[in-house]
UniProtKB/Swiss-Prot annotation:
Keywords: Electron transport, Membrane, Photosynthesis, Thylakoid, Transmembrane, Transmembrane helix, Transport. This is Cytochrome b6-f complex subunit 7. It comes from Prochlorococcus marinus (strain AS9601). InterPro entries: PetM_cyt_b6/f_cplx_su7 (IPR012595). The 4 large subunits of the cytochrome b6-f complex are cytochrome b6, subunit IV (17 kDa polypeptide, PetD), cytochrome f and the Rieske protein, while the 4 small subunits are PetG, PetL, PetM and PetN. The complex functions as a dimer. Belongs to the PetM family. It comes from the Bacteria. Its main location: membrane.
């Protein structure tokens, strides 16, 4: 149980920054 929660948390810690950076880059390129 704890291992599943930890793995899910790790996935979110990886995906959220990638999503934020990707979204920022898309907005920047669209702005140009």
């Amino acid at each position: 149980m704890a291992k599943e929660i930890f793995s899910i948390a790790a996935v979110f810690w990886i995906l959220i920054p990638i999503g934020l950076v990707g979204g920022a880059l898309l907005l920047k390129f669209q702005g140009d």
